[in-house]
């Protein structure tokens, strides 16, 4: 099969989709080229379902090869290692809009691998990778209800920009990625500089309209090069089993969902489930039939919850659709931490801790476009005890990395600049209880924790998770969703922002038919909830707190760049001695900017004084005090400033004649001298005599010899 190409214009970029030359043994393979950023995306699906499989095993792996940017990996092995945080986030970005488009009951293993093979530093690879994944799936013949298009939208000078370059994004008030099918938006991921809801929604609609060019190109490619459709059909529904299950479990589920407390409710649901499965799943039943029973129970449970809400009954925990759960806030929870906040909303709780550091603590990120440093980190951890379970504890999972990134996006817009606040900031959110919306609790707690640490944020930021349940023309938007409502609903979206506007928006839609009007209603209701939470946060922490006594203090100063070598000294000897003497950390930049980090201001001021002495310029005619460091036959060498010595000639020691220098000076003796001269080579001529009162003349008019 020869290579087949489809090209289309996408914003100011040319995009080419190519198949048929590379990775021909995969179920589907596409190379996407977007202005020299090239991504190879492959799809492989197993023909047989693994015995006992009861879920859809879809894996998405996005990987960046350093050769794509003409670089060799660092480290001893000189090869790519485990996925970076950025690679993990893009893997999730690809997964989220694709997963809902596979049919219920499809349990064949599917693996998508997206490999960045060429990188234009101005064109991010996430959009080409997502388009490539959609195209490869469309070619594979799998039961995939696509294709999916994807677009990045910026907002520059009051106008939407399609697929802005990385340079343009620096001037953009918005960085939004939207993915969807021809008729529906499926996923939104964004950060913004306090933009109003109508601008955010307009960006989603703009991106969805523009992505039709990508969808059309994928359809054309699939028509020409696509494989035959799989001979797969969803398993036939066993209506007799479903009816029996309803008779066994529906009333029990109705009663269970009248229980407002999560653990008691889940225990009641588990009891109903166990009794139903004991009746319907027999020992000799095969896995497929058992899975049908489990799926039917899940649908029955979802139907019970959804119908209660759509019929106007109270939600699972007794609230109406617009009420936020009770909120409590406590700051300064950890006495030795630089800043801490305990944010509790219903049965979701986050203990969020802020640590302040110096420039040396910035995170160095080795990306394809080169290394750069990040002064703000936000890490999200959710241990198994948060949901009353046991489980693995260790390195963060994809979900934790994604939630941490969302919370970070929400806070970026209100952080002080480096000039305003020279600290590195690390925020850690420990989820100690979870029943929905833990990432948004991390946003609220992160804001309060930073303020408790003394970071001068521009505004309070709150986040809220919203849900949607839709049946036909009936729909209900749910404010501050529980975990069960997230699991059983049709849309979950998280909105974070200030009183002025949105700073982060994440949306995942599981069904088609979500109109612009429904999204508008949801965003309006989310704003109400956000304003309610902001009011509680402001009442608890109205302004930034004083910095903790245990946080480092940073003193900034500027020196002549030519003096940097004097402060550092040979082999770093001077700066090493300075840090040991004062107990501080000293960072010096090439432009002469100096930052002194200390735990006590006294130590910091001492270090500053020492640096000022080292870098001070000697002034002719000025008086200095310093030790005698060496005696000579014709005078002495006196240190007037760190690194600056001068010659005190024997004739300048005293008004009378000096025959023996040792009679007047000793090594180590501190003397006051005046600078008489500094020649073009920087050599100094000193005088003690100039500071002494001249003796009165003798009666004979003669003076003592000098």
From Swiss-Prot:
<dbReference type="InterPro" id="IPR015847">
    <property type="entry name" value="ExoRNase_PH_dom2"/>
</dbReference>
<feature type="binding site">
    <location>
        <position position="486"/>
    </location>
    <ligand>
        <name>Mg(2+)</name>
    </ligand>
</feature>
<dbReference type="InterPro" id="IPR012340">
    <property type="entry name" value="NA-bd_OB-fold"/>
</dbReference>
<dbReference type="GO" id="GO:0004654">
    <property type="term" value="F:polyribonucleotide nucleotidyltransferase activity"/>
</dbReference>
<comment type="function">
    <text>Involved in mRNA degradation. Catalyzes the phosphorolysis of single-stranded polyribonucleotides processively in the 3'- to 5'-direction.</text>
</comment>
<dbReference type="Pfam" id="PF00575">
    <property type="entry name" value="S1"/>
</dbReference>
<dbReference type="GO" id="GO:0006396">
    <property type="term" value="P:RNA processing"/>
</dbReference>
<dbReference type="InterPro" id="IPR036345">
    <property type="entry name" value="ExoRNase_PH_dom2_sf"/>
</dbReference>
<keyword id="KW-0963">Cytoplasm</keyword>
<dbReference type="InterPro" id="IPR027408">
    <property type="entry name" value="PNPase/RNase_PH_dom_sf"/>
</dbReference>
<comment type="similarity">
    <text>Belongs to the polyribonucleotide nucleotidyltransferase family.</text>
</comment>
<feature type="domain" description="S1 motif">
    <location>
        <begin position="621"/>
        <end position="689"/>
    </location>
</feature>
<dbReference type="GO" id="GO:0003723">
    <property type="term" value="F:RNA binding"/>
</dbReference>
<keyword id="KW-0808">Transferase</keyword>
<dbReference type="InterPro" id="IPR036612">
    <property type="entry name" value="KH_dom_type_1_sf"/>
</dbReference>
<keyword id="KW-0479">Metal-binding</keyword>
<dbReference type="Pfam" id="PF01138">
    <property type="entry name" value="RNase_PH"/>
</dbReference>
<dbReference type="InterPro" id="IPR012162">
    <property type="entry name" value="PNPase"/>
</dbReference>
<feature type="binding site">
    <location>
        <position position="492"/>
    </location>
    <ligand>
        <name>Mg(2+)</name>
    </ligand>
</feature>
<dbReference type="InterPro" id="IPR004087">
    <property type="entry name" value="KH_dom"/>
</dbReference>
<dbReference type="InterPro" id="IPR004088">
    <property type="entry name" value="KH_dom_type_1"/>
</dbReference>
<dbReference type="GO" id="GO:0005829">
    <property type="term" value="C:cytosol"/>
</dbReference>
<keyword id="KW-0548">Nucleotidyltransferase</keyword>
<dbReference type="Pfam" id="PF00013">
    <property type="entry name" value="KH_1"/>
</dbReference>
<keyword id="KW-0460">Magnesium</keyword>
<dbReference type="InterPro" id="IPR020568">
    <property type="entry name" value="Ribosomal_Su5_D2-typ_SF"/>
</dbReference>
<dbReference type="Pfam" id="PF03725">
    <property type="entry name" value="RNase_PH_C"/>
</dbReference>
<feature type="domain" description="KH">
    <location>
        <begin position="552"/>
        <end position="611"/>
    </location>
</feature>
<dbReference type="GO" id="GO:0006402">
    <property type="term" value="P:mRNA catabolic process"/>
</dbReference>
<dbReference type="Pfam" id="PF03726">
    <property type="entry name" value="PNPase"/>
</dbReference>
<dbReference type="GO" id="GO:0000175">
    <property type="term" value="F:3'-5'-RNA exonuclease activity"/>
</dbReference>
<keyword id="KW-0694">RNA-binding</keyword>
<dbReference type="InterPro" id="IPR015848">
    <property type="entry name" value="PNPase_PH_RNA-bd_bac/org-type"/>
</dbReference>
<dbReference type="InterPro" id="IPR001247">
    <property type="entry name" value="ExoRNase_PH_dom1"/>
</dbReference>
<dbReference type="GO" id="GO:0000287">
    <property type="term" value="F:magnesium ion binding"/>
</dbReference>
<protein>
    <recommendedName>
        <fullName>Polyribonucleotide nucleotidyltransferase</fullName>
        <ecNumber>2.7.7.8</ecNumber>
    </recommendedName>
</protein>
<dbReference type="InterPro" id="IPR003029">
    <property type="entry name" value="S1_domain"/>
</dbReference>
């Amino acid at each position: 099969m020869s290579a087949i190409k489809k090209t289309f214009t996408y914003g100011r970029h040319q995009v080419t989709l190519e198949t048929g030359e590379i990775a021909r043994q995969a179920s589907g393979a596409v190379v996407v080229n977007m202005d020299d950023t090239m991504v190879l995306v492959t799809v492989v699906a197993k023909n047989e379902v693994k015995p006992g499989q009861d879920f859809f095993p879809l894996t998405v792996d996005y990987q960046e090869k350093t050769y794509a940017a003409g670089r060799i990996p660092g480290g001893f092995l000189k090869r790519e290692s485990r996925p970076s945080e950025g690679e993990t986030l893009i893997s999730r970005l690809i997964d989220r809009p694709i997963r809902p488009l596979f049919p219920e009951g499809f349990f064949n293993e599917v693996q998508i691998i997206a490999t960045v093979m060429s990188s234009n530093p101005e064109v991010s690879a996430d959009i080409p990778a997502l388009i490539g994944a959609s195209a490869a799936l469309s070619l594979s013949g799998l039961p995939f209800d696509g294709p999916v298009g994807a677009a990045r939208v910026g907002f520059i000078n009051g106008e939407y920009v399609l697929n802005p370059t990385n340079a343009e994004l620096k001037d953009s008030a918005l960085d939004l990625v939207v993915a969807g099918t021809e008729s529906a938006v499926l996923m939104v991921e964004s950060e913004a500089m306090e933009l109003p809801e109508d601008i955010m929604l307009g960006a989603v609609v703009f991106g969805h309209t523009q992505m039709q060019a990508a969808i059309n190109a994928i359809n054309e490619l699939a028509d020409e090069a696509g494989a035959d459709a799989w001979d797969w059909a969803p398993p036939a529904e066993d209506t007799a089993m479903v009816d029996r299950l309803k008779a066994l479990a529906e009333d029990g589920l109705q009663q269970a969902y009248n229980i407002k407390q999560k653990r008691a409710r889940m225990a009641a649901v588990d009891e109903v489930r166990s009794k139903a499965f004991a009746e319907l799943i027999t020992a000799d039943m095969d896995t497929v039939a058992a899975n049908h029973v489990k799926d039917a129970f899940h649908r029955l449970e979802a139907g019970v919850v959804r119908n209660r809400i759509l019929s106007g009954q109270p939600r699972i925990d007794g609230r109406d659709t617009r009420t936020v759960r009770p909120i409590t806030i406590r700051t300064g929870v950890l006495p030795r931490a630089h800043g801490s906040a305990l944010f509790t909303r219903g049965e979701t709780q986050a203990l969020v801790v802020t640590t302040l550091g110096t420039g040396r603590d910035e995170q160095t990120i080795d990306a394809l476009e080169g290394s750069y440093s990040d002064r703000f980190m936000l890490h999200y951890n959710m241990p198994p005890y948060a949901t009353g379970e046991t489980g693995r504890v260790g390195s963060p999972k994809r979900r934790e990395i994604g939630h941490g990134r969302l919370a970070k996006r929400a806070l970026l817009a209100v952080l002080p600049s480096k000039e305003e606040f020279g600290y590195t900031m690390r925020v850690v959110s420990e989820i100690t209880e979870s029943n929905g919306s833990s990432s948004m609790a991390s946003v609220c707690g992160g804001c309060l924790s930073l303020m408790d640490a003394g970071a001068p944020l521009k505004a309070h930021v709150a986040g809220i998770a919203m849900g949607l349940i839709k049946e036909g023309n009936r729909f209900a938007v749910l404010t501050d969703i529980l975990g069960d409502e997230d699991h059983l609903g049709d849309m979950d979206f998280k909105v974070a922002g200030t009183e002025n506007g949105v700073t982060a928006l994440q949306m995942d839609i599981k069904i088609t038919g979500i109109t612009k009007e429904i999204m508008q209603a949801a965003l309006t209701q989310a704003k109400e909830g956000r304003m309610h939470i902001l009011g509680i946060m402001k009442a608890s922490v109205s302004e930034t707190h004083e910095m903790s006594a245990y946080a480092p203090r940073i003193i900034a100063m500027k020196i002549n760049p030519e003096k940097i070598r004097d402060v550092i000294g040979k082999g770093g000897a001077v700066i090493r001695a300075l840090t040991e003497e004062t107990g501080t950390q000293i960072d010096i930049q090439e432009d002469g900017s100096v930052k002194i980090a200390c735990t006590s201001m006294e130590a910091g001021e001492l270090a500053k004084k020492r640096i000022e002495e080292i870098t001070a310029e000697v002034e002719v005619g000025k008086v200095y005090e310093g030790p005698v460091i060496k005696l000579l036959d014709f005078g002495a060498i006196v240190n007037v400033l760190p690194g600056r010595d001068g010659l005190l000639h024997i004739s300048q020691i005293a008004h009378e004649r000096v025959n023996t220098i040792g009679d007047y000076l000793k090594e180590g003796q501190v003397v006051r001298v005046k600078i008489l001269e500094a020649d073009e080579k920087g050599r100094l001529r000193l005088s003690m005599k100039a500071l002494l009162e001249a003796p009165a003349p003798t009666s004979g008019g003669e003076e003592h010899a000098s």
